[in-house]
Amino acid sequence: MDADMDYERPNVETIKCVVVGDNAVGKTRLICARACNTTLTQYQLLATHVPTVWAIDQYRVCQEVLERSRDVVDEVSVSLRLWDTFGDHHKDRRFAYGRSDVVVLCFSIANPNSLNHVKSMWYPEIKHFCPRTPVILVGCQLDLRYADLEAVNRARRPLARPIKRGDILPPEKGREVAKELGLPYYETSVFDQFGIKDVFDNAIRAALISRRHLQFWKSHLKKVQKPLLQAPFLPPKAPPPVIKIPECPSMGTNEAACLLDNPLCADVLFILQDQEHIFAHRIYLATSSSKFYDLFLMECEESPNGSEGACEKEKQSRDFQGRILSVDPEEEREEGPPRIPQADQWKSSNKSLVEALGLEAEGAVPETQTLTGWSKGFIGMHREMQVNPISKRMGPMTVVRMDASVQPGPFRTLLQFLYTGQLDEKEKDLVGLAQIAEVLEMFDLRMMVENIMNKEAFMNQEITKAFHVRKANRIKECLSKGTFSDVTFKLDDGAISAHKPLLICSCEWMAAMFGGSFVESANSEVYLPNINKISMQAVLDYLYTKQLSPNLDLDPLELIALANRFCLPHLVALAEQHAVQELTKAATSGVGIDGEVLSYLELAQFHNAHQLAAWCLHHICTNYNSVCSKFRKEIKSKSADNQEYFERHRWPPVWYLKEEDHYQRVKREREKEDIALNKHRSRRKWCFWNSSPAVA
């Protein structure tokens, strides 16, 4: 259908609506939203502004635009023709103003200058070219009033003027200008699709009322109302922040390989071919191989002299050694640097240590436990005082003498596999490695070597996965039972046994404590104040398995504080996620969480749990009225920064509450005016039917 036919259709009012305003206030996008039903994402709205004008010939070219121009307002059929204009002040717009029925004057609520130009430039121009045409004042880009301006400014073009919080105009500013000029006032947001119909429907009403004054004989215009009030826009609740878990750190594979090369805290010494010495750690070997697990467990259950287990002796030796290495309290009070023990003192100390533990003195032959009948790969095992090659400290070690058939090179490769769970496909001596794996009954390694030799290395992935699962389960078992432990943490409400090698490879804080020159590195008991057993158990579970195993009695804030103290950001994030899940579950079941969230807020901020703090801020702000009514004192006791955040991000916002009050007040006033007007019309209608007494 041709656009000109709308002018010929009976009882169809064609309305020419001219849209004017400064550049970049959103005129063209407002027109496209009405004429083309265009929806835009925030990214498109924030793209670089290019001055454009929506062509009026779209009504002739595009059938869809023509169909959308037709509407019914107050039982009057209309065809709305929108005219876009340039925002440059020096442009000549007299042709656009010609024969206009209504003018929509736009400004941006994020640009105070555009509102100033309404009074200084645009309104005088409109009254100059079309003095009798009704005008509608429209505040565009309403969504910027509640948007995250920092994110908005980051998304805009680099050289764009940043939008400041002080640039955002409250609704009363636009309403004051509209009242001063005697204009109806509306606000719109193309992003939220709010106010578009309000603006153009009421622009049509204003045009039809003006036309009714001139064409009073048109009866279908009698029902047209004056421009209606616009209900205020309630911004949507911001979605709760999602707790993001950073990439999980590796299971200490590289650190374990490094620990094998630099055997700090080593407690096992392998002697190969009577000359090659290789230091290792029981916990890594026992959790990776059932053969070594049985070997070291047998050592703990049986001692050479039949009195007490070797595992208990090792703890005593480390305590005694720690007392030797610690500085004497009397010497600490003396000025000057601490004295280093002389050679004769070391000799005396080591002798005392040996005697205290019942171990063989230097030069004596230690009692060896024969292993040839137990396994053909081993000769014997005994306890002996040895000097650690890294820390240069003497301590008890399990000395294992291997069979002559065990070659040093393949045996080192086997140990590296037990530490890391990885096998290099380019290993040179695969045959020797396979032989040692067969002798030591490590069948998974034997199978992996066979796959590599058969060019089927891809099959090793499943074997490696099963290896790590078995190792993780064995580590959990050793942690829960304290098997092969070499350190005990003394806590406020108990003690927990742990393993220094695993801690060194899993936590830099622990590595610094046990691997440095601190006195804890030589002690088997470490006192950690202000820590409870449940939280420490959760931390150790995480360090051993890289997973959080929450307990019903676990306090998330205590765990976060401990994880932050140990410099474990991944565990902090897991604890934050657990805390949010527990709070959400409680809220879903109808339990009030407002007080708990308030108590979490500043503790989370203090312990660097920024994601949990952001979630708490969001909950408080989106439920501000209910939280404030129940916990007013707690709200007021928060820091100034938090209170400022509450005021800025509370929902519903203050400006909405003010607008809602104004809307309800004006609505009541209009209803009273309409009632009074209807009474007046009713009296005028019936006054002609009253009979006069004189006539009667």
Curated annotation (Swiss-Prot):
* Tissue specificity remark: Ubiquitous, with highest levels in skeletal muscle, placenta, testis, stomach, and kidney, followed by uterus and adrenal gland. Expressed in a variety of fetal tissues.
For the region Disordered, give the residue spans: 327-348
Residues engaged in binding GTP: 21-28, 84-88, 140-143
Supply the InterPro entries for this chain.
Answer: BTB/POZ_dom, P-loop_NTPase, SKP1/BTB/POZ_sf, Small_GTPase, Small_GTPase_Rho
Q: Which GO terms describe its cellular component?
A: cell projection; cytoplasmic vesicle; cytoskeleton; endosome membrane; plasma membrane
Q: Which UniProt keywords apply?
A: GTP-binding, Nucleotide-binding, Repeat
Q: Where is this region: Rho-like?
A: 1-210
Claim: GTP-binding is one of the keywords in the record: yes
Q: Where is the BTB domain?
A: 266-427, 485-552
Any one Gene Ontology BP term: small GTPase-mediated signal transduction
Extract one GO molecular function annotation from the record: protein kinase binding
> Which family is it part of?
Belongs to the small GTPase superfamily. Rho family.
Give the protein name, as stated in the record: Rho-related BTB domain-containing protein 1
State the encoding gene. Answer: RHOBTB1
